[in-house]
């Protein structure tokens, strides 16, 4: 059962990101305007190099926009955001439990509270039995579970995810997609999720943002009408799913062709 939604609200207005100056300037993001509702699961798709990851890094505070405004409302939360990358980023010399609790340790959370929160996070992702394992003893899917637990244990208002399941095999990807949706529904957090997969965006997201080729702009924002929980096999048999997937594919195809034409000029 889902909880009352309470994650961060995000307002982005006229955001631009430019690398370099003068004739060498590279416009990565151009006039991005976007509202993300509290507790929304927002997916972003776009051609390679369109600025998806740059936008996520700016939201995370790991990079700074050149101009424009970002307003994140996360009142009552100790931690504004946490980020999960394609690589789990678990420290190889730490056991799983220590990896998951690292963010709590660096914030000076008392040891007793750390232990309780780490155990809860491990249980959430199904890693309780592997708490004393090292990352090299885990499968790729289990390492990503650890990364998700590490992100959730700090109780962030929003979760920023940059293609977290892209390197996994189809079976593990499907399992973790379902787990992520379950955890999201239980927690009420806001999720911003980057993917190259149209199917994944339609499987997970409330809305899908389609970005243009560089410079990255928002080309279209598409509502995903299918109720959660979603099953990819069932969705694939749906005519509405097929039409929506084709619509997004055509939007992306136009951008890929435009980018190729620019290169070949």
Q: What is each of the regions a protein language model found here?
A:
Residues 45-47:
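The feature captures the beta-strand-to-loop junction immediately N-terminal to the Walker
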Residues 60:
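Helix-to-loop junction immediately C-terminal to a conserved catalytic motif
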Residues 159-162:
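Catalytic Walker B motif of ABC-type/P-loop ATPase nucleotide-binding domains
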Residues 94-102:
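Short coil-to-helix segment of the ABC ATPase nucleotide-binding domain corresponding to the Q-loop/switch region
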Residues 68-78:
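Conserved ABC transporter NBD signature motif
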Residues 133-136, 154:
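Conserved signature/switch motifs of ABC ATPase nucleotide-binding domains
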Residues 148:
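Hydrophobic anchor residue at the start of the ABC signature
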Residues 105, 112-130, 182:
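Conserved ABC ATPase "signature" region
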């Amino acid at each position: 059962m889902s909880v009352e939604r309470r994650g961060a609200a995000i307002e982005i207005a006229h955001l631009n990101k430019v690398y370099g100056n003068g004739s060498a300037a590279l416009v990565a993001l151009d006039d991005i305007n976007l509202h993300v509702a509290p507790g929304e699961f927002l997916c972003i798709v776009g051609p390679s190099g369109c600025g998806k990851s740059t936008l996520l890094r700016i939201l995370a505070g790991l990079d700074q926009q050149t101009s424009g405004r970002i307003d994140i409302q996360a009142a009552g939360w100790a931690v504004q955001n946490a980020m999960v990358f394609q690589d789990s980023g678990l420290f190889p010399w730490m056991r799983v439990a220590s990896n998951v609790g690292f963010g709590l340790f660096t914030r000076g959370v008392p040891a007793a509270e750390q232990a309780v929160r780490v155990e809860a996070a491990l249980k959430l992702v199904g890693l309780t039995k592997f708490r004393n394992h090292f990352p090299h003893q885990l499968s790729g899917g289990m390492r990503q579970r650890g990364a998700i637990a590490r992100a959730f244990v700090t109780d962030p208002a929003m979760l920023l995810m940059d293609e977290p399941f892209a390197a996994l095999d189809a079976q593990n990807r499907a399992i973790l997609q379902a787990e992520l949706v379950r955890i999201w529904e239980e927690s009420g957090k806001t999720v911003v999720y980057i993917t190259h997969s149209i199917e994944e965006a339609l499987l997970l997201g409330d809305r899908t943002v389609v970005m243009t080729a560089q410079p990255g702009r928002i080309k279209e924002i598409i509502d995903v009408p299918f109720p959660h929980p979603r099953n990819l096999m069932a969705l694939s048999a749906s005519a509405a799913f097929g039409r929506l997937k084709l619509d997004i594919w055509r939007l992306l195809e136009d951008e890929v062709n435009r980018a190729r034409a620019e290169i070949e000029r």
